[in-house]
């Protein structure tokens, strides 16, 4: 084989290796084998003082921090926890706990409160909408509220937010709509505790599946007193979920 032929053969081998590597994780998952994941947590003021170096030492790679709730509340521990978690080597992200009331002005106002509080930077995890209460809104109104909030955050930041919810809430209060994922909000953080794998609503999130999974609300982690939410990313590569 001449030199050009040998190089061509090597390229084909490399391409085959890449293809096999990309296929390995879904295949292993389908067969019930363990796939490498990044482990993380989410916290708010309820966790009190946190020893972030110990959290990092426990193998946690990322944390979602509560930044705001409704239109009038910002978490007093957010800024300090964010700084300390980053210093300990964790990827940090911010979430907003939604308190839907009316659609247009309320959703826009909550989005603006969140963006001002979160102060997201390059390398942070993308913003998160935590939607788990309906505020008395019907399905159509709540769908409009969620879309309005997401679109306003996108307008202000250029980032398509991650959606946090539970399977039951999305089905009952959001009508199991696929419209949010189909509108480009394809990153789902699903809360499903005590399961071997999460149930994903909205037609497997319009085919995109889950990206983050909150698998326990009663976890114990070194550096934190009491219970804490435990989370898992679907992959060890968090790059697709980061602010550029």
Task: Give the location of each predicted region.
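C-terminal region of N-terminal signal peptides and the immediate post-cleavage residues
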Residues: 19-35
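Substrate-binding cleft of extracellular glycoside hydrolase catalytic domains
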Residues: 32-57, 61, 65-159
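Catalytic domains of cell-wall/extracellular-matrix polysaccharide-remodeling enzymes
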Residues: 125-203
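Functionally critical loop-and-helix segments that line ligand-binding/catalytic clefts
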Residues: 32-48, 53, 179-244
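Hydrophobic alpha-helical membrane-embedded or membrane-associated segments
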Residues: 10, 14-21
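Bacterial N-terminal signal peptides that target proteins for export
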Residues: 2-12
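Positions that flank functional sites
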Residues: 70, 100, 168-169, 220
């Amino acid at each position: 084989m001449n030199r050009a032929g040998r190089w061509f053969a090597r390229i084909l081998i490399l391409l085959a290796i890449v293809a096999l590597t990309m296929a390995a994780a879904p295949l292993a998952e389908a067969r019930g084998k363990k796939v490498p994941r990044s482990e993380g947590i989410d916290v708010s003021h309820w966790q009190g003082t946190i020893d972030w170096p110990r959290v990092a030492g426990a193998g946690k790679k990322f944390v979602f921090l509560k930044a705001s709730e409704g239109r009038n509340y910002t978490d007093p521990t957010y800024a300090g926890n964010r700084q300390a978690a980053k210093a300990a080597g964790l990827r940090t992200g911010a979430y907003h706990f939604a308190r839907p009331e009316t659609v247009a002005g309320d959703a826009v106002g909550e989005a603006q409160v969140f963006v001002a509080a979160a102060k997201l930077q390059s390398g942070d995890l993308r913003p998160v909408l935590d939607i788990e209460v309906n505020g008395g809104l019907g399905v159509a109104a709540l769908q409009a509220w969620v879309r309005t909030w997401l679109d306003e955050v996108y307008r202000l930041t250029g980032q398509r937010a991650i959606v946090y919810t539970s399977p039951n809430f999305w089905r009952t209060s959001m009508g199991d709509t696929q419209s949010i994922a189909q509108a480009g909000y394809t990153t789902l953080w699903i809360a499903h505790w005590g399961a071997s794998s999460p149930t994903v609503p909205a037609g497997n999130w319009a085919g995109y599946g889950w990206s983050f999974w909150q698998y326990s609300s009663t976890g114990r982690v070194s550096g934190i007193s009491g219970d804490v939410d435990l989370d898992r990313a679907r992959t060890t590569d968090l790059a697709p979920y980061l602010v550029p």
